UniProtKB/Swiss-Prot annotation:
EC number in record: 2.7.7.9
Name assigned to this protein: UTP--glucose-1-phosphate uridylyltransferase
Keyword Membrane applies: no
Function of the protein: Plays a central role as a glucosyl donor in cellular metabolic pathways.
Gene behind this protein: UGPA
UniProt entry keywords in alphabetical sequence: Cytoplasm, Nucleotidyltransferase, Transferase
Residue positions binding UTP: L83, N84, G85, G86, K97, Q160, G189, D220, K358
Catalytic activity: alpha-D-glucose 1-phosphate + UTP + H(+) = UDP-alpha-D-glucose + diphosphate
Length: 467
């Protein structure tokens, strides 16, 4: 049955002239793997907590060389790759998410460029920046990178694969059914970074320049900066793959974790966990760390494994609906590739290396006095004594960046804030200070204005009379 489905799908895909032969064969092989049901269930009893040899505490890494020349040699072996396929739609923005303004008028991409530029300048090295775009972000990104033409940085862009969405009903590609637009296609997750790096020719180009490692991270993680200590450790220990993990907080209970399984280190995602063990997976006691998606990978190893077609990561089925048609997109994650590499490790890094901006509540954190901007680096304010960030919940009125910005005359001071919950039609004046636990809920149809200079400490506000 599966064979007949694949044969039928293959002939339909062969007709799709929008994509390359590599993309066609990659897609067919992904669907074949999915249909053969080779997603093995994890045997819960075989899971072991990784030792410090496998997940190395950051503090135990030996210090990097101090002289500039030795550091330059290390950095000349590195390329930085940012995953740039996502759109800013969830935050109400058009175009690539990486061009949302984060702070002081700088976008994610601006900050990334400034950081690498200052590294290249300081050490006289040439760390190139690669942006992996999707067909959703490619055209915009090409225009945007032109503004860095005079920067001291080589920028390369390439596209990740473009696969057709599958119609659930008959397992045929959506574009074959008259869906000519972008919604007939999807980018198959960031696990696709490895074949795309190879197919684009970028991998061989990097190897010919003497590069040995690529540091891969989400473009919206402001904490994912080049770390010489980590690079030095990987080169000295010949680790082909390193995943940065960090201690879980209650906000991260769904994040993937590293386990030792049948003698290899591997990523365990919540989707792979048998129902009976989901609560155990979420517990901070047993699974103490989670994947930041900051990954350091050896380029020769990527080439070897892609050529051998050995990177068979767990498939993540992602059902969607397009114009009332139920479709399926099959995806893979880059972190799941860890088990195919030799001497793969995790490094348990400080939380500061994980500062993602997924929603406007995160934007509030990074635009506030909780952080400072120094040479393109977003650095936490030392005046904050609590190691964890305040928890922030903003209502739907704040969901889009434009609405969020218009509702704050200036971003409040939150250095001493523990939690903030805002719902309804709330507007903040200039120079507001929030401390402790603050909850502000405007009743339906009521506009609630927090006046300039207001100091709210451990307050529950349901109407103007409570301010």
């Amino acid at each position: 049955m599966a064979d007949a489905k694949i044969a039928k799908l293959q002939s339909a895909v062969a007709e799709l002239n929008q994509i390359s032969e590599n993309e066609k064969s990659g897609f067919i092989s992904l669907v074949s793997r999915y249909l053969s049901g080779e997603a093995e269930q994890i045997e819960w009893s075989k899971i072991q907590t990784p030792t410090d040899e496998v997940v190395v505490p950051y503090d135990t890494l030996s210090p990097p060389p101090e002289d500039l020349e030795a550091t330059k040699k290390l950095l000349d072996k590195l390329a930085v790759l940012k995953l740039n396929g996502g759109l800013g739609t969830t935050m109400g923005c058009t175009g690539p998410k990486s061009v949302i303004e984060v702070r002081n008028g700088f976008t994610f991409l601006d900050l990334i460029v400034i950081q690498i530029e200052s590294l290249n300048k300081k050490y006289g090295c040439n760390v190139p920046l690669l942006l992996m775009n999707s067909f959703n972000t490619h055209d915009d990104t090409q225009k945007i990178v032109e503004k860095y033409a005079n920067s001291n940085i080589e920028i390369h862009t390439f596209n990740q694969s473009q696969y057709p969405r599958l119609v659930m009903e008959d397992f045929q590609p959506l574009p074959s059914k008259g869906h000519a637009g972008k919604d007939g296609w999807y980018p198959p997750g960031h696990g696709d970074v490895f074949p795309s790096l190879m197919n684009s020719g970028k991998l061989d180009a990097l190897l010919s320049q003497g590069k040995e490692y690529v540091f891969i991270a989400n473009s919206d993680n402001l904490g994912a900066i080049v770390d010489i200590k980590i690079l030095n450790h990987l080169i000295n220990n010949q680790n082909e793959y390193c995943m940065e993990v960090t201690p879980k907080t209650l906000a991260d209970v769904k994040g993937g974790t590293l386990i030792s399984y049948e003698g290899r280190v591997q990523l365990l995602e919540i989707a792979q966990v048998p129902d009976a063990h989901v609560n155990e997976f979420k517990s901070i006691e047993k699974f103490k760390i989670f994947n930041t998606n900051n990954l350091w990978v050896n380029l020769k190893a990527i080439k070897r494994l892609v050529e051998a077609d050995a990177l068979k990561m767990e498939i993540i089925p992602n059902p969607k609906e397009v114009d009332g048609v139920k479709v399926l997109q099959l995806e893979t994650a880059a972190g799941a590739a860890i088990r195919f590499f030799d001497h793969a490790i995790g490094i348990n890094v400080p939380r500061s290396r994980f500062l993602p901006v997924k929603a406007t509540s995160d934007l509030l954190l990074v635009q506030s006095d909780l952080y400072m901007l120094v040479d393109g680096f977003v650095i936490r304010n030392k005046a904050r004594t609590n190691p964890s960030n305040p928890s922030i919940e903003l209502g739907p009125e704040f969901k889009k960046v434009a609405n969020f910005l218009s509702r704050f005359k200036s971003i409040p001071s939150i250095v001493e804030l523990d939690s903030l919950k805002v719902s309804g039609d709330v507007w903040f004046g200039e120079g507001v200070v929030l401390k402790g636990n603050v909850s502000i809920a405007a009743k339906s149809g009521v506009k609630l204005e927090i006046s300039d200079g207001a100091v709210l400490e451990n307050k529950v506000i349901n109407g103007p009379e409570d301010i």
